[in-house]
A protein has these predicted regions:
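Catalytic machinery of carbohydrate-active enzymes
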Residues: 1-166
Length: 166
């Protein structure tokens, strides 16, 4: 894979986003010329802003959309989808295993959408939207190890970055 455009889907929560930061550093170490975008809930975007391993932070406003559902919300959702599709991502890494992350992965237009094994998804329906699955992982495996396994499903063997910026 030559300088791929990669979209990471990990929207929330604060601790989960922090725990998955090593994936961006590992991608950057393995594919230094890749373009890495990360979609995250708007209220957590500052955690990722300025991270040298992430080229773009795409804020998501699902909490706002749910609270104030109206035609403006629908317009914002459609614009978000259009923006994603225009990016022409090669690879999406769905680190959630939820319906909403699966739908976004599917609507992204990326040819390769990697997610968790059905048994590791929080919402099984997610697997309908990914076309490559990480192998089943035993319960209790740390989230950092789970995301690394998912990344290896996408890219093959990668050398894990032990240090990553916060």
């Amino acid at each position: 894979m030559n300088a791929p455009k990669i979209l990471i889907l990990k929207f929330s929560a604060l601790g989960d986003v922090v725990h998955t930061l090593p994936i961006a550093a590992t991608i950057r170490k393995s594919l230094p010329d890749s373009y890495i975008a990360w979609m995250v809930e708007e209220r957590y975007q500052d955690i990722l802003a300025g991270n040298p391993d992430i080229d773009e932070v795409i804020p998501l406003r699902t909490k706002v959309w749910r609270k104030n559902w109206n035609s403006k919300s629908l317009g914002e959702i459609l614009n978000t989808i259009k923006t994603l599709r225009r990016q022409n991502f090669d690879l999406v890494l769905d680190l959630h295993g939820l319906l909403k992350s699966g739908v976004i992965a599917g609507l992204s237009g990326a040819s390769t959408r990697v997610g968790f094994h059905r048994k590791n998804c929080k919402e099984k329906i997610n697997t309908l939207f990914t076309n490559r699955k990480a192998p089943h992982m035993t319960k209790g495996l740390h989230v950092v190890d789970m995301t690394l396994t998912l990344l290896q499903t996408a890219l093959g063997k990668v050398e894990e970055a032990k240090l990553f910026p916060l």
